[in-house]
Design a protein with these regions (language model features):
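Active-site "cap" helix and flanking loop/linker of ATP-utilizing ligase/carboxylase catalytic domains
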Residues: 43-65, 82-151, 164-166
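Active-site/binding-pocket entry motifs
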Residues: 9-12, 134, 162-163
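Internal helix-turn-beta structural module
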Residues: 152-179
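Short, well-ordered beta-strand elements within core beta-sheets of diverse protein domains
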Residues: 27-30, 127-129, 175-179
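Internal nucleotide-binding/catalytic subdomain
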Residues: 1-90
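Short clusters of hydrophobic/aromatic residues that line enzyme substrate/ligand-binding pockets
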Residues: 25-28, 145-148, 156
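Hydrophobic side chains in beta-strands
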Residues: 71, 129-131, 158
Length: 179
């Protein structure tokens, strides 16, 4: 297995992590409080036992395992497992991966992941979600989204958008995020 960079999402709609819960209003990587001692605990107390448990139960798995954690005191605690990457965490993790993602995926599929090294950009990444007015409750759909073509030196990830009449429009509560 390989461990990708840590990431933390921000779920609440309001400033200062207030208001209603959402699917994620943004994320950062690396996680400021996840120092080497803490990430070592994660690997030894959670990641290794998870991988070993899958092997012991004869459950072959090839792919991503996203482990959602909280920090209780100085201890990591699992709150969820997903067999996909998280959103919006992916949008701050993948841009930090300097290794060729296709090569990583091929190595996973071939069972040769142990033969590659992951090169990680040491710089931090932040993503902020743009959402429809009213989200996460009743929100507008169909309005045109403009201005993303003017964003420089950042990545724009679309989600909840569609192209209609040659224009990018809102089709869901979360529309895009910039990293």
């Amino acid at each position: 297995y390989k461990i990708l960079p840590t990431a933390k999402d921000y779920k609440r709609i309001g400033e200062g992590d207030t208001g209603l819960n959402t699917g994620g209003m943004g994320a950062i990587s690396p996680v400021p409080f996840a120092d080497t001692a803490f990430t070592d605990k994660i690997e030894h107390q959670i990641v290794k036992p998870t991988v070993e448990g899958l092997k012991m139960d004869n459950l072959p798995y090839v792919g991503f395992i996203f482990i959602g954690l909280i920090k209780v005191g100085d201890e990591p605690k699992v709150i969820e497992y997903n067999v996909r990457m998280g959103d919006p965490e992916t949008e701050v993790v993948i841009p930090r991966l300097q290794s060729d993602l296709v090569e990583v995926l091929l190595a996973m599929a071939k069972g040769t992941l142990d033969q590659i090294d992951l090169n990680i950009d040491e710089r931090a990444a932040t993503t902020v979600m743009a959402v429809s007015g009213g989200y996460p409750e009743a929100y507008e759909k169909g309005k045109e989204i403009t201005g993303t073509e003017n964003i420089k030196d950042s990545l724009v990830f679309h989600a909840g958008t569609k192209i209609s009449d040659g224009k990018v429009r809102k089709s869901h509560g979360t529309n895009n995020n910039s990293t």
